Amino acid sequence: MAQQPESETAQPTIRRFRRELLDLVRRATLNLLTSAVTVAISGCLGPPVLERQVLGYDEVTRMLDEKLLLLNIARVSNQEPVHFTSTSSIAATFNWTATLGASGEVTESKGTNFLNLNIGGSASENPTFSISPVSGKEFTERVATPFQDTIFEFLVFQGGKINQAMRLMSAGIEVQKPDGRFVRFIENDPQRPKEYEEFRQIAAHLQWLNDNRQLFVRPLVFDETLIADFKSTPSAGDINNGFNMGLRWRQKPNGNYELTRLKGGRVVVSNFDPMALTDQERAALDEKIKKNPSGFVYLDIEPNGPGGNLPIQGAIKLRSMFQILNFIATGIRIAPEFEVSPNLPTEETDVGATATLKINVTDSPPDLRLPTVYYDGHYYSVNDTVWDRTTFLILSILFQTTIGRIENVGIPITISK
């Protein structure tokens, strides 16, 4: 038998090697394509779901706080007790998966090639809510205790209108003598028209001073003496340790030493700069102011200063959170506020809206953009003006400072979806 040429014998082996190499390349290409598409699907599916859900929960929490405020205003307007509930925690587990399958038939010879590609993705969430009824002695005391003067100063310092903060937070102005003795009270209540009108005029006057950069709203700062006359020389360790604690040693003219620390005192509203006073005068003024509770903001408009044509000395008495809600609710039907003209027509300033915070009560739903709650067959919503929306924002801030951190709740209500 004749021997075949070597080239003819090697042809099947070469073709088989080529087929195996081609199959290997095709499988590697399919695996690479499958992995790339799967990663792409996972990357596109997960982050948008997480973003939407986190922002969605945040928006729902904000709306709940708004509705809770309006709900309690509606309750008080109907002579019903207030009640607060807080969503103390929201925990959600997110799960997203992506699948990709590829199969087919690829022929080396001429013909039709078949390729099937299956792509799938899914996302799920399992939220758990903890709803805590806000109650107890501690919270009741916070709701019924007047706000401190530092809260009032914070709102004004952040750029808020002082007349807006006063109308919302203040129960009135206590006029006092220079030694702090009581003279009379100017109540911020439309049921006392003359006092209410005078209060509004004083608030507008303070706003005019503030608009013209002639009103100072700040805490008193002064050096508090801890050791008045230290006869020895303090050691280097005492000086360094004191410096780290905000203490300062200072040598007196007689050679002895004095130990002081910088202290922030009570808040003052005045038409003069408290820093222009001496350190001893600021300390003495703080001692005088401390005779009033922390819910009083010291007020001193001197006759010889800017705006001295309407002098007054006393204190702005702040409301509690419950008193603020009651004031707004009473203004809906029982004692609505009325328009007041400035006491001094020459002072061009915005006296503000007629109502501190106007709450509209309607039978039909208002604009969806407005904070609204449905209660007892009516819709309670914030009036659609810049003034009312700003006042409601201030009220929301005060509400958050009142609630604080929810702790030691006896029976939280947990809902798992």
Predicted stretch roles:
Residues 3-4, 11:
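Low-complexity, intrinsically disordered or signal/transmembrane-proximal segments
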Residues 7-8, 15:
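Alpha-helical and His/Cys-centered functional microenvironments
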Residues 17, 21, 26-30:
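N-terminal export leaders
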Residues 34-37:
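Classical Sec-dependent N-terminal signal peptides that target proteins to the secretory pathway
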Residues 40-43:
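C-terminal motif of bacterial Sec signal peptides marking the signal peptidase cleavage site
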Residues 45-417:
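N-terminal amphipathic/basic membrane-interacting segments and domains
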